[in-house]
Amino acid sequence: LSHLYSETLLAPGLGASFQWRHQNNGRDLLGVIDPESPVYATLRQSIERFENTVFELSLNKPNLIEWANSQDTLQDAADIRELRLGGAHAFQQCIELLQTMQMMTDRVEDPVRISAIHHSIGDVMGFIGQRSGSVHYLEQAALSYEQALEIRTQDDMPLEWAHSTYNMALVIHIIGRLEDDTGMLKQALGSIHKAVALLPRDDDTDVWAAAMSSAGTVLYQLGTHRRGSRTLQQSLVAFRNVLTERTAEKNKIAWAITQNNLAATLQAMGEHEEDIGSLEASIPVYDSVLKVLDRDALPLIWAMVSANRVSAMYSLAAESDYLDMAETSVAGFDKISKLFDGTEYVTYQAKAAERMQQAKELVASLQV
């Protein structure tokens, strides 16, 4: 399953649309490019440089170049940003190369190749659109996938059809998130379900699990948007299915993403349904993620999961009138806020401070 898109790490603690790219399956994009091309080596390096990068999904960042130059974790070397800056240029060059290849390839003589080129253009356009928050690029990506699907029919090329259908669903999902359009989220979910049905779970469990995880994420977002307990239940089922394939032994990072998202869904159910049991169940799941994550290697991820855990404690304290837990959540949000001291993540720090104030108000109300 070739794509460059990141996976969502649900972050209710700080209210962020937090994205994390870890899969590195964009290397398949190189399959349609001549290894002798000067773009080939640069693109290969660029795909690797964007691996394990994180960002917040938001509309209309200035451009991919500026995004790449500003990316860091809480502690990141300046030369890494420069490497990613060069990588951003490479993706722009890749589009030009693929479009040239598209013009030079005859659809009738080589339909398989032209469909792969359309699909690859979609991947790069979609990557730039997701990173920069550009709906224009995302719409161009969707158009490229549609062109690929004119050739990759479900009957003639079922697996390729599933790949392009799934990637187009990811693009639609991103647009839906950026524009707060539940109709597009529903459309994305329908396409993901169709693709998952044709993806070979036994032959490639990683691909199947990634697609099922995407379904769980969209269900969560729909469920929290309309406060739908049934939809959140479906999200829980999806994430639990993913965890039958994603284990900490196989892939620690993928497992951690899924465990966090499972906990966030339990937390959402507890908050929306005033269900103390679900809130209580979410906290040890967050704990299990924090025990596995390397705080020094992934400080921003660790901070997000920690904020989620504290927010679950806050919600449980509010629902159960637990004064001690409310006081613990004050200290927890204060600790999260201080993690961002001296960093560029002022928005996250401000949100943590805001949540700390809410927790203080809860403490005051419980002391009456």
Residue spans of the language-model regions?
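TPR/TPR-like (Sel1-like) alpha-helical repeat modules
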Residues: 284-287, 321-344
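Flexible helix-coil transition and linker loops at the boundaries of alpha-helical arrays
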Residues: 53-66, 101-114, 131, 148-161, ...
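Conserved alpha-helical positions within TPR/SEL1-like repeat arrays
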Residues: 69-86, 113-130, 159-177, 206-224, ...
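Short coil/turn connectors between adjacent alpha-helices in alpha-solenoid helical repeat scaffolds
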Residues: 15, 31-45, 79-93, 126-139, ...
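Terminal, low-structured helical/coil segments at or just beyond the last alpha-helical repeat
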Residues: 340-368
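Hydrophobic/aromatic packing residues within the alpha-helices of TPR/SEL1-like helical repeat arrays
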Residues: 50, 91, 98-101, 138, ...
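Flexible inter-repeat linkers and adjacent short helices
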Residues: 1-127, 131, 366-368
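Inter-repeat boundary and helix-capping residues of tandem alpha-helical solenoids
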Residues: 43, 64-66, 90-91, 111, ...
